[in-house]
């Protein structure tokens, strides 16, 4: 990856940050999350970005299930730069969503509910 960044001549525009424990702090510095990916399963980074209240722009190769808030925009990777730029403009036109945490909770992604479910699961394992 670093070689590709160097070969493309964009080293001054790309930061390779490695494994991080402060992802939530990084997300808080962003306005929009882009995922122009060729292949993905269900990327956790998309869920994290939405939980941080970011608008998300995904490639059409990212599963639609990743957009759990239903507020993302999907753009084909073969689309021209103008199409991607228009998606970015649309995100800036939209207000930064303050409802994403509530949307996530409504869809079963509440940290509290998941912690309770995990606790119950472990309690059942101990009893058995």
Language-model-detected regions and their locations in the chain:
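Short glycine/serine-rich donor-binding loops of glycosyltransferases
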Residues: 43-50
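Short hydrophobic beta-strand element within catalytic cores of glycosyltransferases
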Residues: 55-59, 64
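A charged, aromatic-enriched C-terminal amphipathic alpha-helix characteristic of glycosyltransferases
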Residues: 96-128
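A short hydrophobic beta-strand element within the catalytic core of glycosyltransferases
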Residues: 33-34
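Aromatic "clamp/platform" in nucleotide-sugar-dependent glycosyltransferases that forms part
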Residues: 19, 38
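An anion/phosphate-binding loop that grips the pyrophosphate of nucleotide cofactors and donors
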Residues: 30
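Nucleotide-activated donor-binding/catalytic signature segment of Leloir-type glycosyltransferases, i.e.
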Residues: 1-18
């Amino acid at each position: 990856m670093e070689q590709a960044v160097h070969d493309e001549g964009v080293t001054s525009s790309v930061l390779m940050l490695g494994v991080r424990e402060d992802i939530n702090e990084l997300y808080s510095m962003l306005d929009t999350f882009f995922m122009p990916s060729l292949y993905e399963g269900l990327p956790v980074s998309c869920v994290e970005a939405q939980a941080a209240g970011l608008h998300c722009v995904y490639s059409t190769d990212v599963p639609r299930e990743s957009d759990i808030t239903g507020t993302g925009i999907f753009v084909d990777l073969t689309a021209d730069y103008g199409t991607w730029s228009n998606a970015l403009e649309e995100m800036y036109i939209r207000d930064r969503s303050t409802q994403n945490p509530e949307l996530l909770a409504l869809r079963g992604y509440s940290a509290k509910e998941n912690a309770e479910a995990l606790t119950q699961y472990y309690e059942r394992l101990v009893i058995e």
